[in-house]
């Protein structure tokens, strides 16, 4: 979970079962469907639901198809990455990449992936100096990304 830097809204990444990775912008009292509605499937390939929404179920703000195995997320708030400021970064366990998404209000658009991570991305955070730290498993390490 991360707090949007200007709206104060809580944004949450949801690693679905087999597929069904989502970003949800949390609203008080909203039901996001789990475990009855999902874009993914059970690991034994059985269907969780016939659809991913129903009356009273909030649709995800964004979902990845195919699944990236979404993990930690963060917003870029410092000027050190000027072209990325205001963007959302998401770690990918299955993709083994860092995913940058452009955010316009509540609209999320994939923009690019950062290659060369070489491991499952568990978490991403921006440091006070504006650099980005990426926690990677297999092998365990912390990468520091700085603007050129």
Language-model regions, residue ranges each:
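A general secondary-structure boundary signal
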Residues: 87-89, 112-115, 130-133, 137
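Blade-level signature of beta-propeller repeat domains, shared across WD40, Kelch, NHL, RCC1
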Residues: 123-148
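Conserved blade-ending motifs and adjacent loop-strand segments that build the rim/top face
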Residues: 108-128
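Beta-propeller domain segments
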Residues: 1-111, 141, 148
């Amino acid at each position: 979970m991360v707090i949007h830097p200007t709206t104060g809204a809580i944004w949450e990444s949801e690693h679905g079962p087999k597929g069904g990775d989502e970003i949800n912008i949390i609203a008080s009292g909203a039901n996001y469907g789990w475990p009855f509605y999902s874009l993914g499937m059970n690991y034994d390939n059985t269907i969780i639901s016939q659809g991913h929404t129903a009356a009273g179920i909030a649709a995800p703000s964004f979902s990845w198809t195919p699944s990236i195995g979404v993990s930690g997320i963060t917003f870029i708030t410092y000027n050190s990455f000027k072209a990325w400021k205001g963007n959302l970064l998401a770690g990918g366990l299955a993709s083994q990449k860092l995913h940058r998404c452009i955010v316009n209000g509540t609209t999320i658009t994939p923009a690019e992936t950062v290659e060369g991570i070489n491991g499952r991305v568990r978490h991403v955070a921006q440091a006070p100096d504006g650099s980005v730290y990426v926690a990677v498993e297999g092998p365990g390490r912390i990468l520091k990304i700085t603007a050129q």
